[in-house]
């Protein structure tokens, strides 16, 4: 709820350092719009797993990992989210010293992922690990820790490797 979240603006340091062009990487310098998931209506899928990175008398660093989803018609899209917070406590108030969120769409090879002769990976790091064959007919890429191969001539996508349970 953006109205409830408006209270958080006092903790943000929105400025030109924030990249407001993607939801993959959101920081303390991003706009309020980006920090509050822009126009995505996310639903929590899992409870956050909290990892205490540092804990001092007045400061602490924490990392949260969890899954969210969005819905488009009958299709659901899933995302892995990792958030990092560094906070300082004083008797008067708490200060957010740093915030970083990385959101990565879980690639679903069974969904409609083709558009304009491209494979749409969704919200991911712009530097996708990819390798092309010598003839250019086949290329392999990694998405969500899974290895895929795409045969351009046959227009076939195949998952080559993933860990058990993925």
Q: Where does each model-flagged region fall?
A:
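Core segments of small alpha/beta cavity-forming domains
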Residues: 1-38, 115-156, 162-165
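A short local loop/turn or secondary-structure capping micro-motif enriched for an aromatic residue
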Residues: 70-72, 104-107, 149, 158
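Non-catalytic accessory regions used for complex assembly or targeting
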Residues: 9, 59, 91-94, 136
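Residues that act as N-cap/strand-start positions at coil-to-secondary-structure junctions
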Residues: 44-47, 81, 124-126, 133
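A mature extracytoplasmic/lumenal domain signature
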Residues: 64-68, 100, 143-145, 154
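Short, surface-exposed charged micro-motifs
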Residues: 51-52, 84-86, 138
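Short beta-strand edge/turn micro-motifs at domain boundaries
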Residues: 75-128
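Surface-exposed, charged secondary-structure patches
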Residues: 29-75
């Amino acid at each position: 709820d953006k109205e409830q979240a408006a209270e958080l603006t006092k903790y943000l340091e929105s400025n030109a350092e924030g990249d407001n062009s993607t939801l993959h990487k959101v920081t303390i310098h991003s706009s309020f719009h980006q920090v509050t998931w822009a126009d995505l209506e996310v639903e929590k899928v899992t409870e956050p797993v909290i990892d205490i990175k540092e804990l001092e008398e007045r400061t602490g660093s924490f990392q949260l990992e969890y899954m969210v989803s969005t819905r488009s018609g009958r299709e659901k899209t899933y995302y892995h989210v990792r958030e990092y917070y560094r906070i300082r406590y004083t008797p008067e108030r708490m200060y957010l010293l740093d915030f970083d969120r990385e959101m990565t769409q879980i690639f679903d090879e069974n969904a409609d992922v083709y558009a304009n002769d491209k494979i749409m990976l969704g919200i991911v790091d712009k530097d996708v690990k990819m390798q092309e064959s010598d003839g250019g007919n086949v290329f392999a890429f990694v998405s969500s820790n899974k290895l895929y191969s795409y045969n351009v001539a046959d227009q076939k996508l195949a998952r080559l490797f993933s860990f058990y349970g993925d």
